[in-house]
Protein backbone atom coordinates (compact mmCIF):
# COMPACT_ATOMS: atom_id res chain seq x y z
CA UNK A 1 0.00 0.00 0.00
CA UNK A 2 1.41 3.38 -1.05
CA UNK A 3 2.45 5.69 1.78
CA UNK A 4 2.90 9.46 1.91
CA UNK A 5 5.78 11.17 3.69
CA UNK A 6 5.55 14.95 3.25
CA UNK A 7 2.86 16.00 5.71
CA UNK A 8 4.90 18.02 8.22
CA UNK A 9 5.77 20.81 5.80
CA UNK A 10 2.11 21.31 4.92
CA UNK A 11 1.03 21.18 8.57
CA UNK A 12 3.60 23.75 9.76
CA UNK A 13 2.04 26.68 7.90
CA UNK A 14 0.42 29.69 9.56
CA UNK A 15 -2.58 29.45 7.21
CA UNK A 16 -3.15 25.87 8.34
CA UNK A 17 -3.15 26.88 12.01
CA UNK A 18 -5.68 29.64 11.38
CA UNK A 19 -7.85 27.05 9.66
CA UNK A 20 -7.36 24.69 12.62
CA UNK A 21 -8.48 27.44 14.99
CA UNK A 22 -11.62 28.01 12.92
CA UNK A 23 -12.48 24.30 13.07
CA UNK A 24 -11.77 23.94 16.78
CA UNK A 25 -13.75 27.06 17.73
CA UNK A 26 -16.72 26.59 15.40
CA UNK A 27 -19.97 27.48 17.22
CA UNK A 28 -18.03 27.81 20.52
CA UNK A 29 -16.84 31.43 20.55
CA UNK A 30 -18.80 32.16 23.71
CA UNK A 31 -16.58 29.89 25.82
CA UNK A 32 -14.04 31.56 28.11
CA UNK A 33 -11.11 29.36 27.03
CA UNK A 34 -11.66 30.25 23.37
CA UNK A 35 -12.13 33.96 24.11
CA UNK A 36 -8.87 33.97 26.08
CA UNK A 37 -7.01 32.13 23.29
CA UNK A 38 -8.42 34.47 20.65
CA UNK A 39 -7.38 37.58 22.58
CA UNK A 40 -3.75 36.89 21.59
CA UNK A 41 -4.45 34.69 18.59
CA UNK A 42 -1.33 35.45 16.55
CA UNK A 43 1.08 34.60 19.37
CA UNK A 44 -0.82 31.50 20.50
CA UNK A 45 -0.93 30.04 17.00
CA UNK A 46 2.75 30.83 16.47
CA UNK A 47 3.62 29.02 19.72
CA UNK A 48 1.64 25.94 18.63
CA UNK A 49 3.28 25.94 15.20
CA UNK A 50 6.75 26.28 16.75
CA UNK A 51 6.06 23.44 19.22
CA UNK A 52 4.99 21.18 16.35
CA UNK A 53 8.05 22.00 14.24
CA UNK A 54 10.45 21.42 17.13
CA UNK A 55 8.65 18.42 18.59
CA UNK A 56 8.19 20.09 21.97
CA UNK A 57 4.40 19.94 22.14
CA UNK A 58 3.18 17.61 24.90
CA UNK A 59 -0.42 16.58 25.41
CA UNK A 60 -1.97 18.28 28.44
CA UNK A 61 -3.44 16.29 31.35
CA UNK A 62 -6.97 15.05 30.72
CA UNK A 63 -10.03 16.15 32.64
CA UNK A 64 -12.78 13.56 32.83
CA UNK A 65 -16.54 13.59 32.64
CA UNK A 66 -18.93 10.64 32.82
CA UNK A 67 -22.01 10.61 30.58
CA UNK A 68 -24.86 8.18 31.08
CA UNK A 69 -26.88 8.61 27.86
CA UNK A 70 -27.28 6.45 25.88
CA UNK A 71 -24.88 4.42 28.05
CA UNK A 72 -22.24 5.08 30.68
CA UNK A 73 -19.07 6.39 29.08
CA UNK A 74 -15.92 8.15 30.33
CA UNK A 75 -15.12 11.24 28.25
CA UNK A 76 -11.60 12.70 28.22
CA UNK A 77 -11.40 16.48 27.83
CA UNK A 78 -8.33 18.49 26.83
CA UNK A 79 -7.59 22.25 26.94
CA UNK A 80 -8.45 24.27 23.85
CA UNK A 81 -4.84 24.61 22.51
CA UNK A 82 -4.63 20.81 22.28
CA UNK A 83 -7.72 20.77 20.07
CA UNK A 84 -6.16 23.37 17.76
CA UNK A 85 -2.97 21.29 17.51
CA UNK A 86 -5.02 18.17 16.70
CA UNK A 87 -6.98 19.98 14.01
CA UNK A 88 -3.77 21.32 12.45
CA UNK A 89 -2.61 17.74 11.89
CA UNK A 90 -6.04 16.50 10.80
CA UNK A 91 -6.42 19.23 8.17
CA UNK A 92 -3.70 17.53 6.12
CA UNK A 93 -4.09 13.89 7.15
CA UNK A 94 -7.85 13.28 7.37
CA UNK A 95 -8.80 13.63 3.70
CA UNK A 96 -5.80 11.54 2.64
CA UNK A 97 -6.78 8.72 4.99
CA UNK A 98 -10.48 8.97 4.13
CA UNK A 99 -9.71 7.89 0.58
CA UNK A 100 -8.55 4.56 2.04
CA UNK A 101 -11.75 3.96 4.02
CA UNK A 102 -14.42 1.60 2.75
CA UNK A 103 -17.36 3.28 1.02
CA UNK A 104 -19.59 1.42 3.49
CA UNK A 105 -18.01 2.97 6.61
CA UNK A 106 -20.33 5.43 8.35
CA UNK A 107 -19.94 7.64 11.40
CA UNK A 108 -17.07 10.10 11.71
CA UNK A 109 -16.58 10.27 7.94
CA UNK A 110 -17.51 13.55 6.28
CA UNK A 111 -20.84 13.17 4.46
CA UNK A 112 -21.48 9.71 5.88
CA UNK A 113 -23.26 10.04 9.20
CA UNK A 114 -26.03 8.03 10.87
CA UNK A 115 -28.74 9.25 8.50
CA UNK A 116 -26.74 8.26 5.41
CA UNK A 117 -26.30 4.85 7.07
CA UNK A 118 -30.05 4.59 7.64
CA UNK A 119 -30.88 5.60 4.05
CA UNK A 120 -28.45 3.03 2.66
CA UNK A 121 -30.03 0.20 4.68
CA UNK A 122 -33.52 1.25 3.62
CA UNK A 123 -32.46 1.39 -0.02
CA UNK A 124 -30.77 -2.03 0.01
CA UNK A 125 -33.66 -3.78 1.79
CA UNK A 126 -36.12 -2.50 -0.79
CA UNK A 127 -33.92 -3.05 -3.84
CA UNK A 128 -32.61 -6.56 -3.00
CA UNK A 129 -35.32 -8.25 -0.87
CA UNK A 130 -34.33 -11.81 -1.84
CA UNK A 131 -30.64 -11.29 -0.99
CA UNK A 132 -31.21 -9.51 2.32
CA UNK A 133 -33.60 -11.79 4.20
CA UNK A 134 -31.27 -12.23 7.20
CA UNK A 135 -28.83 -10.08 9.14
CA UNK A 136 -25.86 -10.18 11.50
CA UNK A 137 -25.39 -7.35 13.99
CA UNK A 138 -22.34 -7.14 16.27
CA UNK A 139 -20.00 -4.67 17.92
CA UNK A 140 -16.74 -4.47 19.87
CA UNK A 141 -16.75 -5.07 23.62
CA UNK A 142 -15.68 -1.78 25.31
CA UNK A 143 -14.00 -0.43 22.18
CA UNK A 144 -12.31 2.79 23.37
CA UNK A 145 -10.89 1.37 26.64
CA UNK A 146 -9.40 -1.63 24.79
CA UNK A 147 -7.78 0.06 21.77
CA UNK A 148 -4.28 -1.42 21.52
CA UNK A 149 -1.59 1.27 21.15
CA UNK A 150 0.96 -0.79 19.15
CA UNK A 151 -1.78 -1.90 16.73
CA UNK A 152 -3.00 1.69 16.25
CA UNK A 153 0.55 2.92 15.60
CA UNK A 154 1.02 0.12 13.08
CA UNK A 155 -2.20 1.09 11.27
CA UNK A 156 -1.04 4.71 11.00
CA UNK A 157 2.23 3.56 9.45
CA UNK A 158 0.41 1.70 6.66
CA UNK A 159 -0.36 5.10 5.07
CA UNK A 160 2.09 7.59 6.64
CA UNK A 161 5.89 7.55 6.44
CA UNK A 162 6.53 11.06 7.76
CA UNK A 163 8.56 10.24 10.89
CA UNK A 164 8.18 13.69 12.43
CA UNK A 165 4.38 13.51 12.22
CA UNK A 166 4.34 9.90 13.41
CA UNK A 167 6.29 10.87 16.54
CA UNK A 168 3.72 13.59 17.28
CA UNK A 169 0.84 11.14 16.83
CA UNK A 170 2.62 8.51 18.95
CA UNK A 171 2.98 11.04 21.78
CA UNK A 172 -0.78 11.71 21.72
CA UNK A 173 -1.55 7.97 21.73
CA UNK A 174 0.88 7.36 24.62
CA UNK A 175 -0.63 10.22 26.64
CA UNK A 176 -3.06 7.54 27.87
CA UNK A 177 -1.12 5.36 30.31
CA UNK A 178 -0.47 1.73 29.45
CA UNK A 179 -0.60 -0.12 26.14
CA UNK A 180 -4.37 0.05 25.77
CA UNK A 181 -7.08 2.65 25.95
CA UNK A 182 -8.24 5.85 24.32
CA UNK A 183 -10.64 8.52 25.56
CA UNK A 184 -13.52 9.66 23.37
CA UNK A 185 -14.07 13.40 23.44
CA UNK A 186 -11.68 14.79 20.81
CA UNK A 187 -11.78 14.88 17.03
CA UNK A 188 -8.45 13.06 16.87
CA UNK A 189 -9.80 10.17 19.00
CA UNK A 190 -12.64 9.79 16.51
CA UNK A 191 -10.14 9.75 13.65
CA UNK A 192 -7.99 7.15 15.43
CA UNK A 193 -11.03 4.88 15.81
CA UNK A 194 -11.61 5.01 12.05
CA UNK A 195 -7.95 4.26 11.32
CA UNK A 196 -7.97 1.37 13.79
CA UNK A 197 -10.75 -0.44 11.91
CA UNK A 198 -10.23 0.59 8.29
CA UNK A 199 -8.30 -2.54 7.26
CA UNK A 200 -10.92 -4.68 9.00
CA UNK A 201 -13.58 -3.16 6.71
CA UNK A 202 -11.71 -4.23 3.58
CA UNK A 203 -10.91 -7.71 4.91
CA UNK A 204 -14.52 -8.24 5.99
CA UNK A 205 -15.71 -7.39 2.48
CA UNK A 206 -13.50 -10.21 1.16
CA UNK A 207 -14.53 -12.69 3.88
CA UNK A 208 -11.06 -12.34 5.44
CA UNK A 209 -9.53 -14.06 2.37
CA UNK A 210 -10.75 -17.50 3.47
CA UNK A 211 -11.37 -18.37 -0.18
CA UNK A 212 -7.67 -17.97 -0.97
CA UNK A 213 -6.63 -20.88 1.28
CA UNK A 214 -7.65 -24.34 -0.10
CA UNK A 215 -7.38 -25.98 3.34
CA UNK A 216 -9.72 -23.41 4.91
CA UNK A 217 -12.15 -23.66 2.00
CA UNK A 218 -12.33 -27.43 2.40
CA UNK A 219 -12.78 -27.20 6.19
CA UNK A 220 -15.47 -24.53 6.16
CA UNK A 221 -17.31 -26.04 3.18
CA UNK A 222 -17.70 -29.25 5.15
CA UNK A 223 -18.89 -27.33 8.20
CA UNK A 224 -21.33 -25.28 6.13
CA UNK A 225 -22.92 -28.40 4.65
CA UNK A 226 -23.15 -30.17 8.01
CA UNK A 227 -24.69 -27.16 9.75
CA UNK A 228 -27.10 -26.55 6.87
CA UNK A 229 -28.39 -30.11 7.29
CA UNK A 230 -28.52 -29.89 11.09
CA UNK A 231 -30.41 -26.57 11.22
CA UNK A 232 -32.90 -27.09 8.38
CA UNK A 233 -36.43 -26.21 9.56
CA UNK A 234 -38.50 -24.65 6.78
CA UNK A 235 -39.73 -25.95 3.44
CA UNK A 236 -37.25 -23.63 1.73
CA UNK A 237 -34.38 -25.16 3.73
CA UNK A 238 -35.37 -28.70 2.74
CA UNK A 239 -35.80 -27.62 -0.87
CA UNK A 240 -32.24 -26.28 -0.88
CA UNK A 241 -30.90 -29.49 0.69
CA UNK A 242 -32.66 -31.59 -1.96
CA UNK A 243 -30.47 -29.99 -4.64
CA UNK A 244 -27.50 -32.01 -3.41
CA UNK A 245 -24.14 -31.67 -1.70
CA UNK A 246 -22.43 -30.23 -4.77
CA UNK A 247 -24.99 -27.43 -4.98
CA UNK A 248 -24.41 -26.51 -1.33
CA UNK A 249 -20.65 -26.61 -1.83
CA UNK A 250 -20.80 -24.33 -4.87
CA UNK A 251 -23.14 -21.92 -3.11
CA UNK A 252 -20.80 -21.59 -0.12
CA UNK A 253 -17.78 -20.97 -2.34
CA UNK A 254 -19.77 -18.29 -4.14
CA UNK A 255 -20.47 -16.59 -0.83
CA UNK A 256 -16.72 -16.44 -0.12
CA UNK A 257 -16.08 -14.18 -3.10
CA UNK A 258 -17.54 -11.07 -1.51
CA UNK A 259 -19.95 -9.75 1.10
CA UNK A 260 -22.07 -7.31 -0.88
CA UNK A 261 -24.05 -5.78 1.96
CA UNK A 262 -21.83 -5.10 4.98
CA UNK A 263 -21.78 -1.74 6.77
CA UNK A 264 -20.13 -0.23 9.83
CA UNK A 265 -21.36 2.67 11.98
CA UNK A 266 -18.65 3.48 14.57
CA UNK A 267 -17.89 -0.02 15.95
CA UNK A 268 -21.31 -1.50 15.06
CA UNK A 269 -21.12 -3.96 12.15
CA UNK A 270 -24.21 -4.90 10.12
CA UNK A 271 -24.19 -7.63 7.46
CA UNK A 272 -27.28 -8.33 5.35
CA UNK A 273 -27.37 -11.75 3.70
CA UNK A 274 -29.66 -14.57 2.58
CA UNK A 275 -28.18 -17.43 4.64
CA UNK A 276 -28.05 -17.58 8.45
CA UNK A 277 -25.74 -20.62 8.40
CA UNK A 278 -23.14 -18.61 6.51
CA UNK A 279 -23.59 -15.66 8.89
CA UNK A 280 -22.76 -17.92 11.85
CA UNK A 281 -19.43 -18.68 10.19
CA UNK A 282 -18.83 -14.98 9.50
CA UNK A 283 -19.30 -14.03 13.16
CA UNK A 284 -16.72 -16.69 14.05
CA UNK A 285 -14.24 -15.14 11.60
CA UNK A 286 -14.92 -11.64 12.96
CA UNK A 287 -14.17 -12.81 16.51
CA UNK A 288 -10.91 -14.42 15.39
CA UNK A 289 -9.87 -11.32 13.44
CA UNK A 290 -10.59 -9.02 16.38
CA UNK A 291 -8.58 -11.20 18.76
CA UNK A 292 -5.60 -11.97 16.50
CA UNK A 293 -5.20 -8.83 14.37
CA UNK A 294 -6.65 -5.98 16.46
CA UNK A 295 -6.20 -7.34 20.02
CA UNK A 296 -9.78 -6.45 20.96
CA UNK A 297 -12.81 -8.51 21.90
CA UNK A 298 -16.11 -9.19 20.19
CA UNK A 299 -19.15 -8.24 22.26
CA UNK A 300 -20.81 -11.58 23.14
CA UNK A 301 -24.24 -9.99 22.64
CA UNK A 302 -24.13 -10.28 18.84
CA UNK A 303 -27.33 -11.17 17.01
CA UNK A 304 -28.32 -13.11 13.88
CA UNK A 305 -31.96 -12.88 12.83
CA UNK A 306 -34.52 -12.37 10.10
CA UNK A 307 -35.08 -8.91 8.63
CA UNK A 308 -38.85 -9.40 8.91
CA UNK A 309 -38.40 -9.26 12.71
CA UNK A 310 -36.68 -5.86 12.43
CA UNK A 311 -33.03 -4.77 12.35
CA UNK A 312 -32.35 -2.50 15.34
CA UNK A 313 -29.36 -0.33 14.46
CA UNK A 314 -28.41 3.34 14.53
CA UNK A 315 -31.48 4.34 16.56
CA UNK A 316 -33.96 2.93 14.04
CA UNK A 317 -35.62 -0.46 13.49
CA UNK A 318 -35.56 -1.44 9.82
CA UNK A 319 -38.14 -3.69 8.18
CA UNK A 320 -38.32 -4.71 4.51
CA UNK A 321 -40.96 -2.08 3.67
CA UNK A 322 -40.78 0.53 6.44
CA UNK A 323 -38.61 2.01 9.21
CA UNK A 324 -39.64 2.55 12.82
CA UNK A 325 -37.89 4.54 15.51
CA UNK A 326 -36.31 2.69 18.42
CA UNK A 327 -38.68 2.48 21.40
CA UNK A 328 -36.23 4.23 23.71
CA UNK A 329 -36.12 7.29 21.44
CA UNK A 330 -39.90 7.33 21.01
CA UNK A 331 -40.49 7.19 24.78
CA UNK A 332 -37.94 9.97 25.37
CA UNK A 333 -39.76 12.27 22.91
CA UNK A 334 -43.19 11.53 24.41
CA UNK A 335 -41.94 12.27 27.93
CA UNK A 336 -40.24 15.50 26.87
CA UNK A 337 -43.39 16.77 25.16
CA UNK A 338 -45.52 15.80 28.19
CA UNK A 339 -43.19 17.74 30.53
CA UNK A 340 -43.29 20.83 28.32
CA UNK A 341 -47.08 20.69 28.00
CA UNK A 342 -47.41 20.61 31.79
CA UNK A 343 -45.58 23.95 31.84
CA UNK A 344 -48.30 25.40 29.61
CA UNK A 345 -46.02 26.12 26.65
CA UNK A 346 -47.59 26.58 23.19
CA UNK A 347 -47.03 23.93 20.52
CA UNK A 348 -44.63 26.10 18.53
CA UNK A 349 -42.37 26.54 21.56
CA UNK A 350 -42.59 22.82 22.36
CA UNK A 351 -41.69 22.00 18.77
CA UNK A 352 -38.68 24.32 19.00
CA UNK A 353 -37.41 22.86 22.27
CA UNK A 354 -37.91 19.27 21.11
CA UNK A 355 -36.64 19.95 17.59
CA UNK A 356 -33.61 17.67 17.95
CA UNK A 357 -35.65 14.58 18.83
CA UNK A 358 -38.42 15.44 16.36
CA UNK A 359 -35.85 15.87 13.59
CA UNK A 360 -34.32 12.48 14.40
CA UNK A 361 -37.68 10.71 14.49
CA UNK A 362 -38.88 12.30 11.24
CA UNK A 363 -36.40 10.19 9.26
CA UNK A 364 -38.45 7.09 10.12
CA UNK A 365 -42.06 6.37 9.13
CA UNK A 366 -43.51 8.20 12.12
CA UNK A 367 -46.19 10.51 10.71
CA UNK A 368 -48.90 8.84 12.83
CA UNK A 369 -46.84 9.23 16.01
CA UNK A 370 -46.18 12.92 15.35
CA UNK A 371 -49.86 13.52 14.55
CA UNK A 372 -50.91 11.96 17.86
CA UNK A 373 -48.42 14.15 19.70
CA UNK A 374 -49.58 17.24 17.82
CA UNK A 375 -46.05 17.76 16.53
CA UNK A 376 -46.65 17.11 12.84
CA UNK A 377 -44.56 19.30 10.53
CA UNK A 378 -45.80 18.54 7.01
CA UNK A 379 -43.24 19.00 4.29
CA UNK A 380 -44.47 21.49 1.72
CA UNK A 381 -44.50 20.73 -1.96
CA UNK A 382 -42.35 22.89 -4.21
CA UNK A 383 -45.42 24.74 -5.52
CA UNK A 384 -46.42 25.64 -1.96
CA UNK A 385 -42.92 26.81 -1.09
CA UNK A 386 -42.64 29.28 -3.98
CA UNK A 387 -46.29 30.39 -3.74
CA UNK A 388 -47.57 29.15 -7.08
CA UNK A 389 -51.32 28.54 -7.15
CA UNK A 390 -53.59 27.32 -9.91
CA UNK A 391 -55.48 30.16 -11.60
CA UNK A 392 -59.19 29.46 -11.81
CA UNK A 393 -61.44 30.89 -14.56
CA UNK A 394 -60.73 32.19 -18.05
CA UNK A 395 -57.55 34.01 -18.96
CA UNK A 396 -58.22 37.60 -20.08
CA UNK A 397 -57.13 38.32 -23.64
CA UNK A 398 -55.37 41.57 -24.67
CA UNK A 399 -57.38 44.16 -26.55
CA UNK A 400 -56.57 45.30 -30.07
CA UNK A 401 -55.14 48.61 -28.85
CA UNK A 402 -52.84 46.74 -26.45
CA UNK A 403 -51.61 44.54 -29.30
CA UNK A 404 -50.98 47.50 -31.59
CA UNK A 405 -49.14 49.33 -28.84
CA UNK A 406 -46.68 46.43 -28.34
CA UNK A 407 -43.46 46.79 -30.32
CA UNK A 408 -40.79 44.18 -30.99
Indicate residue ranges for each PLM-predicted region.
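Non-catalytic, polymerase-adjacent accessory regions of viral genome-replication enzymes
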Residues: 1-46, 401-408
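Active-site-proximal segment of RNA-dependent polymerases
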Residues: 3-7, 90-148, 218-219
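Conserved polymerase palm-domain catalytic core
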Residues: 44, 51, 124-266, 270-285, ...
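Right-hand nucleic-acid polymerase module
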Residues: 78, 87, 213-257, 277-281, ...
Amino acid sequence: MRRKGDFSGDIARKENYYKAFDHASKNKHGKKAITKFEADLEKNLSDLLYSFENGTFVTSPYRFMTVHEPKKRLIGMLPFPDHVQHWAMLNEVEDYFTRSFSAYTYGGVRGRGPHAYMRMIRKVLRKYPERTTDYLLCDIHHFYPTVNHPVLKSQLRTRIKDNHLLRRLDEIIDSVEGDTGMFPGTKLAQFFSLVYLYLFDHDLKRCFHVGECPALVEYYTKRYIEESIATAKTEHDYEELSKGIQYLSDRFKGYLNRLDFCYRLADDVLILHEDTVFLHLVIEWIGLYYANELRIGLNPRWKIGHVTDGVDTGGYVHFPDHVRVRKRNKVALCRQIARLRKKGLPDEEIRRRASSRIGFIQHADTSNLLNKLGMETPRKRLGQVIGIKKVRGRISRPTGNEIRGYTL
